[in-house]
Amino acid sequence: MSRRIDSHEFYEVDKSGKEISFLFDGSVVWAREGDTISSALVASGRKIVSRSFKYHRPRGIYDADGYGPESLVTVDDEPNLLADRVLARNGMDVRSQNNWPSLDFDLAEINDVFVPFLPNGFYYKMFHKPKWLWPIAEKQIRKVAGLGSIDTAGRHNSRRYEKRYRFPDICIVGGGPSGLAAAKAALGEGKQVLLLDDHPELGGHSLHSLSQIQQSPFSELEGLSEHEGIRKLAAELQDNPNLEIMSGAMVFGVYEDNLVAAQWGNDLMKIRADKVILATGASDRHLVFDNNDRPGIMTARGVERLIMVHGIAPAEEAVVVTTHDGGYHTALLLHGAGVKLKAVVDSRASGTEGVFEKQLEDLNIPIYREMTAHRAHGRKKLQRVDVGPVKGGESFQSFDCDLLVTAVGLMPRLNLLSMGRGR
């Protein structure tokens, strides 16, 4: 069961946000200022937040970052907003999508039983004979197609959708450590800088990192932990009159002649810059195993974000599956939040004996080498994980847990770079 934490062994928990509440499918959810919808739902103990598009399998919070498949919700009659990115507001009305009659009891989940009979494009071949059958089937297929419902009643027709323009010297996409470092350097040369980031808070992955800053080009940050240093850097830059920051701006296009297109709230931003810097960072890779989509399976960065940014322990018992040293950092954060670590499962024969691994060994946390996850058990929530040899074969051991963390490396976000024909 997830819960709020008042203290953590390795950092100071921010408890300054005042308590607010909102509705989720008609039920009251308590949150703190600074929470996203997703983090508030996790803190309330909710496991299922959505249903998969076709088979209506239950979905939980996966990466808490807006890049998972689970976080589309309707907020105040506006459909398809990312619960991982939308900040909780007092009194807001949030509804889940793609389920009937309810999120926890979705009759369309029966589709999951008929997976072998519903391959991709099945509707092109089925229901066409006899001829009278297709018009009936077509109506039913159209009912289940698409996600979210448009506000056809016009209850919020006062919303305005504008087109706005900016002409900075430098446009930086990404407000993580690289983007902020680039902004600081450009501002030092007297440039007009526009910084766009798709999250409510600047800082990227450094917001949930305990690692110590070393060999920094900025001497004032040397020796600080990353989460302290990045907040200090962001606070310093925000007061610069030559910098405009657009938090929560989703950049969706980079075109010829340095034209950048973004959605910022309800506005379409068209930005023409002398230079464009892409500092879009990376996201967690996915681990393939049986039932890897069940509620209770999360990425490492998603877990770290819940703990360090929102002060939430996402489970009672956890297993961490990793392929690199970063998995030990996540495991240490879980331990510091009071989560019982059943095992750290490392696919490598040996690591680099980093500081986080050494701390876990001193805490007598079981570490299994050359192993990985084989199968997850549970339907509406994770109940057990089977682990075994990386090369396959029989599972070696099973662990009862309500959280499986996958830390299997990062993949750079190259979409905008590819679109802009970058190399």
Regions found by a protein language model. Name each.
Residues 2-423:
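Residues forming the flavin
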